[in-house]
Amino acid sequence: MSLEVLAKSVDNLRARAEIRRRGLDFVTPWFTKVLHKTRIVRGVNVGLLEKSWDVLRTLQFIEQRVSKTTPILDLGAYASEVLCSLHKLGFSDLTGIDLNPTLTRMPYKQNIKYVTGDFAHTEFPNETFGAITAISVLEHGFCGPKVFREVSRMLKTGGYFIGSTDYWPEKVDTSGVTVYGLDWTVFSKDELRNLIEEARKYGLVPVGELNFEASERTVSWLNRDYTFAWFAFQKVNVPGDPIDKDSAS
């Protein structure tokens, strides 16, 4: 499956139980969050329980398709659980990028390369990574051509772009709502279809079937009710590839 939707809240609970069973849970405990808030301990509040389903789906996909030595990049890596869990699974070439300057306080900074910067304009060489992840990133200030162009440039041919986004089949109006200083989008079915077609222009194609069906609004945030969609694309060579192979930006 290349596109899946979190159908029920219980599926998210089951995913967290599986993450914990496998020893891959890095969500910061509440008492540690208190220490961070009072600045007794410096650190990042990692992970969200609400993101259990898409994090697990991403980990499973990478385990099945990517070797442990493949270079992997996480977009929007600040507070993301993905790289921590991949490190625990034995993946050895991990990089995270985010605009947040406190990114370097993330766990395993001795083993994971953290880069402060804009993931839509990076200095990574062409075709550096075998997989790129983006958990709940695209809905914030989304600009399809800019993001897909850069992802395609950084990905090796045959590499994967895996992530999730806020979703509901019918349009959820978020006009005038900003999150992290950026416009926020809850993608509709039509918008998600358009996103997939935009990605194709940059050689990023679905790896399997697409399922847009949703049955339960599993998330309530900022007075909006919706769920999550998870996706997996693979980079292929396409005629008239718009990526400039001589440019790193």
Spans of model-derived segments:
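A conserved beta-strand element that flanks and buttresses the S-adenosyl-L-methionine
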Residues: 133
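Short catalytic micro-motifs in class I SAM-dependent methyltransferases
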Residues: 136-140
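Class I SAM-dependent methyltransferase SAM/SAH-binding core
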Residues: 73, 77-121
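Core SAM-dependent methyltransferase catalytic element
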Residues: 210-249
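Conserved alpha-helix/loop element of class I SAM-dependent methyltransferases that forms part
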Residues: 50-69
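A short glycine-rich, Lys/Arg-flanked "PGG" loop and its adjoining helix->strand segment in the class I
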Residues: 145-160
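Conserved class I S-adenosyl-L-methionine
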Residues: 162-189
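Short alpha-helix
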Residues: 184-209
